[in-house]
């Protein structure tokens, strides 16, 4: 055992390794593909990871693309980051997309396809009001930073 917080995990596919960090200080752990897949240019595919986890209340799992695959192959995640809520108990699946305009991407069972990052999250309730407090920024949104009136 380590001094890191334990997360309960069920390995749904016993032939795949448990998620692990490449280095102790890494934020994410690698997730592996349960099946082979060929993703055509511009297409997407939902790929299982063979694991289910039980996150504590007040945490969230975020599924991120792997930077090397994104840079080399154009492989990304459609809804990056994917969100795993604390009360979800099913298999973690990843909706991969091939952003390369020309070549298909081959996924082989066992390939590392994504990273899972566990973070604390602030759980809140919303209170409806008639108006919000004034701020210097106000309602200046998209593209407004650094511009003067």
From Swiss-Prot:
Keyword field: Hydrolase, Magnesium, Metal-binding, Nucleotide metabolism
Pfam families noted in UniProt: dUTPase
Record's catalysed reaction(s): dUTP + H2O = dUMP + diphosphate + H(+)
Enzyme Commission number(s): 3.6.1.23
Cofactor requirements of the protein: Mg(2+)
Superkingdom per UniProt: Bacteria
Keyword Transferase: no
Listed transmembrane segments: none
GO MF annotation, one: dUTP diphosphatase activity
Keyword Phosphoprotein: no
Biological processes annotated in GO: dUMP biosynthetic process; dUTP catabolic process
Top class in the EC scheme: hydrolase
Entry binding sites for substrate: 66-68, 79, 83-85, 93
Protein role: This enzyme is involved in nucleotide metabolism: it produces dUMP, the immediate precursor of thymidine nucleotides and it decreases the intracellular concentration of dUTP so that uracil cannot be incorporated into DNA.
UniProt name for this protein: Deoxyuridine 5'-triphosphate nucleotidohydrolase
Top-level taxonomy: Bacteria, Bacillati, Actinomycetota, Actinomycetes, Mycobacteriales
Gene name of this polypeptide: dut
